[in-house]
Amino acid sequence: MIRITIFFLLITTNIIYSQNIAERDSLKILNVLETQRQAWNNFDIDEFMQGYLKSDKLVFSGSNGPVYGWNFVKVRYLNTYSSNELMGYLDFEINDLFLISKKVALLLGKFNIERDNENLSGYFTLVFKKIKGNWYIVSDHTS
């Protein structure tokens, strides 16, 4: 009986610990998006880009095809959203977030950009990777 009780305690402790890790990581990932949203709404592409992994392996896929590398993704944003009017006001709706592994997560959501002349909206899929305790976007598919 004692063995069964100890076994049960070990299993439930491990499950609770795993849930806490998942919740903590989910909050960190959502914080990356919130930081990006605030940076965007302050018209700060440099700060917005901090949510992306600064690597040549970063990929952004949009309607014009993929763009590889942090610097090229940044240039794409600067060219596409070259003024405060074009950037507008950004908001997100998160549809789903789940951990694929301890260091990889997938987030599905919708973006809305309110501008004076026209609004934009679409969907995105982000792949996050945990590096040295921090979560970064390594792949962004936005349409």
Enumerate the predicted regions with their spans.
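A short gly/proline-enriched turn/hairpin at secondary-structure junctions
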Residues: 57-68, 81-85
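Structural motif
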Residues: 54, 100-101, 131
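Short, low-complexity N-terminal intrinsically disordered segments enriched in polar/charged residues
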Residues: 9-51
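Hydrophobic pocket/interface hotspot
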Residues: 36, 48-49, 57-58, 73, ...
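Short beta-strand edge/turn micro-motifs at domain boundaries
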Residues: 121-143
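Sec-dependent signal peptide recognition
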Residues: 1-8
